A protein has these predicted regions:
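Short acidic, glycine/proline-enriched helix-loop-strand junctions
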Residues: 30-36, 79-96
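Alpha/beta enzyme core
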Residues: 1-79, 106-120
């Protein structure tokens, strides 16, 4: 990582440190902003924002967290449907359909279609 810092990198990312001690050593050795990649079930310790800052890390990403949550939600929803035959009394939170469409930007897609598709 130091070679990249010396070459002018703005942020340094060291792949998968496996202990707090290793992360602390990286923080002591490299005088550039450090990026931690936090993956539940990965090699890097799961640390809080404060713990990361104390070790010298200024940035953290959590790239898999939402995917893991989505997987658990999908499994829960379909297990409920399989068991009950319905989504009634589902414990898993769901978006309202229109709110989900807006979240996904479908309103912009539909406006684009309306403006540009032929009326023929």
């Amino acid at each position: 990582g130091q070679a990249f810092a010396d070459a002018g990198a703005d942020i340094i990312f060291i792949e998968s440190p496996e202990s707090v001690d290793e992360m602390a050593e990286i923080g002591r050795r490299i005088d550039k902003p450090l990026l931690a990649n936090i993956v539940v079930g990965g090699s890097t310790p799961l640390l809080s924002e404060k713990e990361l800052a104390d070790l010298g890390y200024q940035l953290a990403i959590f790239p898999g967290s939402a995917f893991l949550a989505m997987g658990a939600a999908v499994e829960s929803v379909y297990a409920h449907i399989k068991t009950t035959g319905s989504t009634e009394s589902l414990d898993t939170p769901l978006y309202e359909f229109q709110a989900f469409n807006q979240l996904m930007g479908f309103d912009k897609v539909w406006a684009f279609e309306k403006a540009w598709l032929s009326q023929d």
